[in-house]
Amino acid sequence: MGLLCSKNRRYNDADTEENTQTAEIERRIELETKAEKHIQKLLLLGAGESGKSTIFKQIKLLFQTGFDEAELKSYQPVIHANVYQTIKLLHDGAKELAQNDVDFSKYVISDENKEIGEKLSEIGGRLDYPCLTKELALEIENLWKDAAIQETYARGNELQVPDCTHYFMENLHRLSDANYVPTKDDVLYARVRTTGVVEIQFSPVGENKKSGEVYRLFDVGGQRNERRKWIHLFEGVSAVIFCAAISEYDQTLFEDENKNRMMETKELFEWVLKQPCFEKTSFMLFLNKFDIFEKKILKVPLNVCEWFKDYQPVSTGKQEIEHAYEFVKKKFEESYFQNTAPDRVDRVFKIYRTTALDQKVVKKTFKLVDETLRRRNLFEAGLL
């Protein structure tokens, strides 16, 4: 009898412990479910090369702990690859222009750099790139300074030359140091095509989550073949942050050199606006790469782009930059209202001028986005 009671007591104790564990699991699930309800989902969209991923990296630096040493080191081969790929693009572009351009002579690489150019082009075409040594960096620097390469770089918009080119070429000695660890700026400039979906959770007010919203930001591949992966992310989105690189009005797509990048951005923007699942979703439009735009607009007329063919310059210098920017902004505003159903026009729509590489601008912009979304939430709750 005593043995039976002892067994029953053990079973009861085990049941009690199991019930306690079950209750704890259920409590945690309930807490996590409640926490999830308070997390706002942001979708970062845009065509390839729009600067989305740079914005994403800035968020990690600004509102999280940034990149630890292991993460920084992981970018070293990426940055070295960027250098090799870029110098190959410029070398091969110069050769093509020397063969086909009317003013071909200025694209002919000097005799002392021809052999170096062929060697670097071969390296740039490999699947595995060597570590950037001082010797290779010096050869790249010599080729970069060649007059033909500089003339080719001036026509980089025709050759898919990336925005990071000048920055990395001017830092070759540091990048080739045996103990090189990328800086946060190096990481921001590093060019990696986003494939699939990456996410980050953050609060623009810092660690004190009680005083601000918590966001989960999703960055997705911008190239055409990546866009089918967006679909499952569309439900339950608080806001779409759409990045448009306004400096790329004279460039063509990486994946389709017959398609103007700005026209592709326009079509993608309009397609996103029409999606039924975004009926009540706020839209934040980032007119990005303003730093490049303000330099380019003084050299390349805005009306080279079909969408902007009715643009008329009115001045020079800073006035012209502002005039051109306001014209582009107005075009996007018109597109928004033309492609938004009448019953959706009251959803939040804001436009921000951004430079993804400028941390102060990105920080200020996201605080404005946070303020806008918090006001919307208060309004919907009847508290405003």
UniProtKB/Swiss-Prot annotation:
Cellular component per GO, a single term: cytoplasm
Positions where lipid (S-palmitoyl cysteine) attaches: 5
Binding site for GTP: 49-54, 163, 188-189, 194, 222, 288-289, 291, 356
Annotated family: Belongs to the G-alpha family.
UniProt domain G-alpha: residue ranges: 38-384
Protein name per Swiss-Prot or TrEMBL: Guanine nucleotide-binding protein alpha-1 subunit
GO molecular function, one term: G protein-coupled receptor binding
Residues in coiled coil: none
G4 motif, as annotated region: 284-291
Keyword Lipoprotein: yes
Source organism of the structure: Lotus japonicus
Cofactor: Mg(2+)
Role summary: Guanine nucleotide-binding proteins (G proteins) are involved as modulators or transducers in various transmembrane signaling systems.
UniProt free text on domains: The helical domain (69-189) is required for self-activation.
Region named G2 motif: 186-194
